[in-house]
Every structure is written in structure tokens, then in C-alpha cells.
């Protein structure tokens, strides 16, 4: 049965039924879920649009990626989509095994691309990720200017760490990072260190003894993706971002589609098939279509995959415990790479508990 709001006769008249895969057949086997039904119509329309001759879909081996792949294979009647996976160098063996399973299940090839700079080298050269991408970026900028982690006003710090540009009539250097440190944009601004409770107080009391940076993601994924889009001239880029997952990636977009993305020598559109999916929609899709996820979920009990035991993850301690049990070699590797960040994060969390306790007692 077709879903409400989907006019089957109109679809027939508009000649959506083409080739072996048909939109009508897709909708007749669709669960009675408006989000899933509308999404399939939209996915069919985007993927089979004659405007797009070369399409790339970036897979991760995670649960969102699994649903996205299932949608794409159901809708891609002319097999226009190339499937790729970015090997960060810190991937679970269970993820690699799952990708092989997906190739066999769907009869596709998932091309693997290595990081431009391996994460171990990136962390050694630029610094380790700490707490979040934004926090890491601002701390990195301040470290580059030999910041002393001082509790001073913005008017005092800017002349001390920035340079005055006479031509532009403004300060240049780590201005935005100092504004973050001082909270000069106001308490409601997301560019304020107070968005992370007690962080400023912690850093002043415990200045980092290691370099902090957020560029590991850039060299392992972002730059690899841009290089791919540029070299192969793809005109549609499909990625598995969901609004409901939260985080910087999801809040950076307002809808499931945007035009005129740019990479060196190439322009392309971006499509996010799962953007409007809530957890319940994804669960219903899994159950209805029999989508199976990797052992990271079904055996290890992880809630996320991707870069193993990433310090940005709230549950990195749990991930470390699981990785030690199931993939001990990877456990040793991540501790060698992110060890300083893990210890600093533990120290920060303990500091927060102590400060909260002091506040309650006063």
C-alpha cells in the first residue's frame, strides 16, 4: 500500500516507473511511516535526476550509514552511485568485516581511501583532540600564540597576544580565541568557554602540558572527501547526517539538501537522505527491511562507531573498556595516540565534581 500524501496515479503519469527498480514498487513495500515514505520519494527523485551523472556516497560502517546505503541501493535504478569509505587508521575490525558483508549483500564495491595524514602522525605533529572540536580549535589557536592561560580581561589580553594592523585598523591574531577564553560575546553565545562548565577554571589551575588540536578529522576525512570530489568530478555528494543526532555536524545544516558545494575545480550538490529521521524512524526502517548492523553494535554493545575511542566521545571510557576486551591491539594503539587527552579529560571531570561539591557546601 502507498502511504498517505503519495499520489500513485500521479507518479505513474510522471513516469517514475523506469527500469527494474520502480518507485511504485518501493512504496508498495514501504512501512506506514510518513517520514520514511516521503524520504524514499525524495531519495528516488534526487538520485535518478538526470542532472546528476556522477554520484558518490560516503559510508562509515555505522548504523546510520547502513540505512542510508539500503535507501541508495533501493533507489539507484541506473547504478550511478559510487560507494566510498574513509579509512582513518583507527577503525574497528568489526567495521571492516561489516563493510565486506555489505559489499556481498548489495553486490557493490566500497572503495577505501586512506587518510591524507594518518591520525597518529597528525596528533604527534599538531596535537591531540580534547573535549570537542570547538574547544580543541580555540585551545590550539591560543597555544600557537604561546598563551599563558591567564585570567585577565579581553582588553588586557588582546594587546599582549595580538598585533595591530594599521591598514585594516583592527587587531589580528588569536582575537576570536581570546574572545572565547574571556567570554566576551556573552554567556548565551556558543563561542564562550563557559559552555563547558568549570573549563576555564580547570585550565588555569591545570595548564595543558601537551599540544591540543582538532585537525585529525580534517586530514583523515574532510580533506580526503574534498580531494575525491575534486578529482572525480562528482556532481552529487550523499552523506549520512541526521538532525536528531545533534552535534556540530547536524546543526550546521538546515535541511536535507543544499546546492553549489565547492571543492577544488568542481561544484556539487549535497544530499542527506537521513536528515529528518528520528531514532524511532531508523529503528522502524531497520525492522521492516531487515537491516543488520555491525558487531560493534550487536556484540560489542557500542552506541557509535567511527574513529575508535575518540576523545570527543562522551562515552570514551566505555569504548576503551570494550576495545580492550574485543580488540586489544587497537586498545594499545589509541592509548599511545590519545593518552594525554584521556588523562586530561579524566582530570577535568574530577575537577568538575570537586567544584560542584564546593558550590553545594558553600
Feature annotation, model-predicted:
Residues 2-281, 286-288:
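ATP-dependent adenylation/nucleotidyltransferase module used to activate substrates
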Residues 2-24, 52, 266-267, 279-362:
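ATP/NTP-dependent adenylation/nucleotidyl-transfer catalytic domains that generate, transfer
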